[in-house]
Amino acid sequence: MRIISQICIATTLILCGSHSLYAAECSAKSGAATVPLLELYTSEGCSSCPPADKWLSGIKQDASKIIPLAFHVDYWDYIGWKDKFSKAEYNDRQRKIAAFGGAGFVYTPQFVMNGRDFKGSDGSRLNSMIETNQKLASRANLSLDAVTQANGEITLKTSAQAVKPSDAKNADIYVALYENKLVSFVKAGENSGRELKHDYVVREFFGAYQINNENQFSKIFTLKPEWNGRNAGAVIFVQNSQTGEILQSLALKFCNG
């Protein structure tokens, strides 16, 4: 079964006759099976979090099987170390997940699989969850297209469509920009003196967006040139606003120009 198609091609832009500049273009489209979304809520101010961060980094991102994201929360910053990757809006998302019927409260480190509290960061349980999800038919068609322009900017085109119009009613669409291979040298707080390494860190988060009356969603994001050359990519996912269930998710690593 073809789950994900991803294409990276070099595109030549011809300017002023004899001058040519190059841009990199990447694209991805979702397939017939549901790809699970695994979220980690973590903080550099939490002494229990580094093992969870390391475990998440060890997950090979096979975009046809699982999509990991790490949301750094800021409610531990008061202990003495401000996590530079944290945002208050990620706290809000974690609380919303708790309200869906997950753990019922927020804590770190917390893993969330498809909108539900996921305990037990062991490979066997994760593989079981992946296999279960791959048996579920996708309820949304997603696409991501990223073009690195000649000036270094990245144009990210996103689109979503519900497989069945009935699924569009409570469908919330989110777009995340993530970055890998991040390193921090912690100088205060519970992890003082430690070097922490992170992957799949959410640097920007957009949404919720909705599917229109024609069962369509599309939006274009223009990313600044500093995103070019980073170990980064984008994720789009559709979540039921009433239950927290993930209808489909899709990841794309940027092709650098």
State what each model feature region is.
Residues 1-6:
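Positively charged n-region of N-terminal signal peptides that target proteins for export
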Residues 84-104, 110, 114-257:
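Short, conserved sequence motifs used for protein processing/export or organelle targeting and
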Residues 22-107:
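Active-site-proximal cofactor/substrate-binding loop regions of enzyme domains
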Residues 7-19:
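Bacterial N-terminal signal peptides
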